[in-house]
Amino acid sequence: MADHSWDKTVEEAVNVLESRQILRSLRPICMSRQNEEEIVKSRANGGDGYEVFDGLCQWDRTSVEVSVSIPTFQKWLHDEPSNGEEIFSGDALAECRKGRFKKLLLFSGNDYLGLSSHPTISNAAANAVKEYGMGPKGSALICGYTTYHRLLESSLAQLKKKEDCLVCPTGFAANMAAMVAIGSVASLLAASGKPLKNEKVAIFSDALNHASIIDGVRLAERQGNVEVFVYRHCDMYHLNSLLSNCKMKRKVVVTDSLFSMDGDFAPMEELSQLRKKYGFLLVIDDAHGTFVCGENGGGVAEEFNCEADVDLCVGTLSKAAGCHGGFIACSKKWKQLIQSRGRSFIFSTAIPVPMAAAAYAAVVVARKEIWRRKAIWERVKEFKELSGVDISSPIISLVVGNQEKALKASRYLLKSGFHVMAIRPPTVPPNSCRLRVTLSAAHTTEDVKKLITALSSCLDFDNTATHIPSFLFPKL
């Protein structure tokens, strides 16, 4: 392993912040004595006060069954520009009052476990609203951080097997904060205050990483703290070559764990091996893997048995948790650094208390209702067997080529009663337009069969790719 130690580096950076009196602290506000007693009780009984269920219930269907007004439906069919303004028009309201809607089965959301409509989670939010309203309005460092937020952080740290966790306003903000804070190490420890090249942080980023990672890395680069190296998507030979040729001591590798537009996994085992060889800091964005992958819902790192090799695990509460917000599971020192230098965390209002309460309930429910994880992977297996398409996750990317083909297929599915979006540039490279299908534990076997039948009428499974051809990768 390389001589450089990230544990020592982050400790030195935190010490510098403390010596300059700019190390920020989180002080949980206790909303009331009753709230404090409830939280202590919840900790004592492991959250046993939360009601859970043994199988799919009728209310689960609200997370996958939706409706759109006829005016919206018509504009959508013809791909007419819309800002949603038609909902305020008299005609649209009249249509709504008459109950004239187009019912659609949702196959494009990220509510993988169907928890957004779970009554236990809804009740947790509702009870918090009734008692506290939205809670104190301010950034977490000022007054927005409560015992609800702290309890949520503790539960997520336990899930991810990390020392601590920092809850952020969104997953996007979490990635931004993490990347900027990592870069700040260079300026904090630079001999002259402005880092020389060999004092900067070298960040190695997968070519298909999420926009929030890309923007965070770009901001850190703009601040003069990092140099960026982009490696070809999941290409460990290319990454190894870049790492071996880089003379900079402080190295970081950042990657999505489960890629949102392709549905493929990062090569976690190979990344772990390279980490042992080069001693880099490994950061993963587990937005689509948290609660979905792993025996306990711990995510992609748990699935591949390499949790100890992940230094920072970024996640979101707006997908499988069915709520809102983001988080960074990490060591206590990294949390101190990020909460002191991560601007998107520092200068954003904390998530409302009802959302923190709901998210904690979601952690409990996801842990206990194991059948939900089993159900979504059963749907993955069924889709694979019925379509013959080689897929490995609940995110199914059916690459059809140009924009016209993708839109035509999406319109056909819309007419057939399915909400499946055509993904186009700039979200994906030109000529790699696709239908992005996502599965949920709230879907049934019959839902999947009906979707496969509709898909078979608008595309040829035998000639449909599930990943981007290498020649379409963004140029380095």
From Swiss-Prot:
If researchers knock out this gene, what phenotype do they report?
Light-dependent spontaneous cell death due to the absence of D-biotin. Strong accumulation of hydrogen peroxide H(2)O(2) and constitutive up-regulation of reactive oxygen species- (ROS)-responsive and defense genes. Reduction of both chloroplastic and nuclear biotinylated proteins. Accumulation of conjugated salicylic acid (SA).
Positions occupied by motif Peroxisomal targeting signal PTS1? 474-476
**Coiled-coil ranges (or none):** none
Q: Which domain of life is it from?
A: Eukaryota
Which residues does substrate bind?
24, 210, 427
- Kindly list the GO CC terms recorded for this protein: cytosol; peroxisome
Q: How would you classify this enzyme at the top EC level?
A: transferase
Annotated InterPro entries: Aminotransferase_I/II_large, AON_synthase_class-II, PyrdxlP-dep_Trfase, PyrdxlP-dep_Trfase_major, PyrdxlP-dep_Trfase_small
Which positions does the record annotate as the modified residue N6-(pyridoxal phosphate)lysine?
A: 319
User: Which sites bind pyridoxal 5'-phosphate?
Assistant: 171-172, 260, 285-288, 316-319
Keywords in alphabetical order: Biotin biosynthesis, Cytoplasm, Peroxisome, Pyridoxal phosphate, Transferase
Q: How does it assemble?
A: Monomer.
What is recorded about the protein's domains? The C-terminus PTS1 domain (474-476) is required for biotin biosynthesis activity and peroxisomal subcellular localization.
**Protein name, please?**
8-amino-7-oxononanoate synthase
Gene of this entry: BIOF
